[in-house]
Curated annotation (Swiss-Prot), chain B:
Keyword Iron: no
Protein name, as recorded: Vacuolar protein-sorting-associated protein 25
Subcellular location: Cytoplasm
Chief location category: cytoplasm
Keywords: Cytoplasm, Protein transport, Transport
Assembly and oligomerization: Component of the endosomal sorting complex required for transport II (ESCRT-II), composed of SNF8, VPS36 and 2 copies of VPS25.
Stretch forming the signal peptide: none
Amino acid sequence: MVVCEKNVLLLLFAKRKMDRFMWTNGLLEMNETLVIQQRGVRLYDGEDKAKLDVGGVVLSTHRLLWRDQKNHECCICIPLSQVIFFEEQAAGIGKSAKIVIHLHPAPENKEPGPYQHSKYSYIKLSFKEHGQIEFYRRLTEEMTQKRWENTPVSQPIPTGTGPKAGRTRAVGIVGIERKLEEKRKETDKNISEAFEDLSKLMEKAKEMVELSRSIANKIKDKQGDITEDETIRFKSYLLSMGIANPVTRETHGSGTQYHIQLAKQLGDMLQAPLEERGGMMALTEVYCLVNRARGMELLSPEDLVNACKIFESLKLPLRLRVFDSGVMVVQLQSHSEEEMIASALDNVSDKGSLTAEEFAKLLGLSVLLAKERLLLAEKMGHLCRDDSVEGLRFYPNLF
Amino acid sequence: MSFEWPWQYNFPPFFTLQPNVDTRQKQLAAWCSLVLSYCRHRKLYTLDVLEAQESPVFNNKKIERKLSVEAIQVVFEELRKKGNLEWLDKNKSRCLIMWRRPEEWGKLIYQWVSKNGMVNSVFTLYELANGDDTEKEEFHGLEDWMLLRSLQALQTDGKAEIITMDDGKGVKFF
């Protein structure tokens, strides 16, 4: 019965075929799961009605199957991997809603199916008894998840190797259409990937850094080809981005030209602000001040620290100082610590006792620096502390 | 007679354990002498740590400051090192306060004994600590354990001998 029908089909419909389909016994393989099925579906080869009757369509994790409603033994299937993309076609007057499925060309080693050749590269499923919305949704899910890739079934199903395989064999307008569609999807996928997950964005950023590093190294190797000017410019771009360029440090030693220039610039720039603030500024304040003034070509924190470290060796009137607590400040060389502590003691004695906040207000310093000064005075034995629920207060050391 | 508090008692930083090492040493010294003089004044011979927290010594309600438990432990440890304190239990919850060391008590007792020409006499412990004759003496009311230790100190010096009698202990002075 089945064989009879097959021959009839082959004879009658030699020209217009849906050649991707294969005969199947309709049973699901191991690892293959049923997703959804819908009766009352007619198959179309491209725009033409397939000469098969109405049947039921079955979607599994691996394949799309169709079984004749009247003759249950007539069952054909197509692997989901053959599907390039699919879309809905709305119902019209006298016409049922359809799902159009674009397919890869049939591979050479495909098993026999109801059609040998087809001039169309797409088929349609016409939902005579509705159910297309749900079916479309599930098909979308399966095509996104691509579960057949994870659990291959034992039956040898020729699988498409992806858009690339399609590309090499595509011809004509259909091929061009397909290429455009694939490109659009690829771009879309990239964009959504990058934005969807910030960690993926970080990875891409890492790749960027790696890329610029490798370029820097290439520059180092090809020193002769690229002009000195360009090399320096490129390096300064990298530095302003905050990417440590090992090349520069190696070739010029510590205290690179860049840092030296920067240190001199800072020396000029910070004089006035430092005097306004009593001779001392936290490094974070310096960073904000300097970058705000620069506008473009901002400094990286690393550069700032490295430039500050060489103040002394360049005989500039500034110093970088690190407190016990780890706080870093830039202070004028003329700034004397003893003076500061003596004046702190006077302030505290005057008022009887002071908290860091009160002291900061009194002197116009930031609270952080005020606290550092009080702690230093305590370390020297000039002050002692009163730690209670009311907060931390400093008293003159009367002990 | 009310107790005279030292100036540190009203100085808020006194109740915060100072991080500066030198300052801390001075602070602890002041605490030790305060604790000892307070105990002497109130004739306290034992202290319970938890109770001590609420005692006026460590808790100055007027300036709203109190010494933390950790700091109290530090003060007690300092006293122990000096020989003025002895823990009664492993958990360090109760201790003996010796604002006068046994040797010093022994000396005082012996002075009284020899001043009154009672060398070579025998006394019961009760007589010494609670007898009418000793009422005006500083060691009057001395707790048994301390009295015993003081007499033991004298014994070591060869100035006394502790005798066991029918209804308790006694001592003979030489």
